[in-house]
A protein has these predicted regions:
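Compositionally biased terminal segments of proteins
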Residues: 1-173
């Protein structure tokens, strides 16, 4: 998703929901950190968004802007309404959110290292490729990612995250 497409999604979500603040927890959060994100970000057709102050409007957003909606058919991208609980995130992630302002709407974006931990937790090939692209573009610091992994609550999760991180690093050579 290109930045202008993300901006369209955010403006429309704000208008539909009459909400000014959202969590942006997926790969599109990278737009808050760089003007020219990795190609893996541009390929995505969705932004993972959650209404920050009014979770009860999630169903409305999904119906109006979600996959298969008129908005999605018209624009070729959609809003995937999620909850922050679906992401495996290290302790303190809320204090590291970065704002991305579009008009009156603010998307609070995951900090890039928290985003990497979340993507490692999901572990799909596209997520691991995304993580690799962030390292290749020098948008992330390995030491910080390792620190964030140690901040995850369950030992079993930390071991899985370390293993997936090592796989990404091995692929990068």
């Amino acid at each position: 998703m290109k930045r202008r497409e993300l901006e369209t999604a955010l403006r429309t979500a704000g208008r539909v929901a009459r909400e000014t603040e959202f969590f942006l927890i997926g790969s599109q959060a990278v737009h808050a950190y760089c003007r020219r994100p990795p190609a893996e970000v541009l390929l995505s057709q969705e932004c993972d968004l959650y209404p920050m102050n009014r979770p009860e409007i999630a169903n409305l957003l999904d119906a109006r802007l979600g996959r298969g909606s008129r908005f999605a058919r018209r624009h070729g991208f959609y809003v995937d309404v999620v909850t922050p609980e679906i992401a495996s995130l290290p302790t303190g992630w809320q204090s590291r959110l970065k704002p991305l302002r579009v008009g009156r709407t603010t998307a609070w974006c995951l900090e890039v290292h928290d985003l990497i931990v979340s993507k490692l937790a999901v572990g799909r090939l596209k997520d691991l490729e995304f993580v690799g692209a962030l390292f290749q573009r020098r948008l992330a610091n390995l030491k910080t990612v390792r620190h964030h992994i140690r901040q995850c609550s369950r030992h079993r999760d930390r071991a899985r995250l370390r293993s997936r991180l090592q796989s990404v690093l091995d692929e990068l050579g």
